[in-house]
């Protein structure tokens, strides 16, 4: 086997000590500046405690679709919010930077809507034409998990509870 000489890329989320964080929280990860000066920020929206809980795929999928609209309405420069494979939260990407407090407040408002007001009509893109796995949605599960997350309180700090 040939010897590898190039360094392997460092994946930030694999460097995080998942035993030290206290979910739910919003964590600022990093900012990247593009060749034309454009700034993109990455945030960890951790909804459940790593290695203790995972949101079932149907509920996480429904939260994903719903907050795609709700966070876009609340966070200027919203680009994307994609679920972690471990099903404990999401990566949020934005143009520019936002405080973790502002992001946590937007997330809290979005989860409050899901938990207490959302109907099936509020969940976008749930058809075969608009979703790559349209059968794997559960508004009931999304609502129950949103309530659990809100009961815990969303912190603007991953290591110290600073609930917004």
Curated annotation (Swiss-Prot):
It catalyses: S-(5-deoxy-D-ribos-5-yl)-L-homocysteine = (S)-4,5-dihydroxypentane-2,3-dione + L-homocysteine. Its cofactor is Fe cation. One of its GO terms (biological process) is quorum sensing. Keywords: Autoinducer synthesis, Iron, Lyase, Metal-binding, Quorum sensing. The keyword Lyase applies. The keyword Chaperone does not apply. Binds 1 Fe cation per subunit. Its EC number is 4.4.1.21. It comes from the Bacteria. It is an enzyme of class 4 (lyase). It holds the Pfam family LuxS. Fe cation binds at residues 61, 65, 131. GO terms for molecular function: iron ion binding; S-ribosylhomocysteine lyase activity. Belongs to the LuxS family. HAMAP family: LuxS. Involved in the synthesis of autoinducer 2 (AI-2) which is secreted by bacteria and is used to communicate both the cell density and the metabolic potential of the environment. The regulation of gene expression in response to changes in cell density is called quorum sensing. Catalyzes the transformation of S-ribosylhomocysteine (RHC) to homocysteine (HC) and 4,5-dihydroxy-2,3-pentadione (DPD). PANTHER family: S-RIBOSYLHOMOCYSTEINE LYASE. Homodimer. NCBIfam families: PRK02260.2-3 (NF002605), PRK02260.3-1 (NF002608). This is S-ribosylhomocysteine lyase.
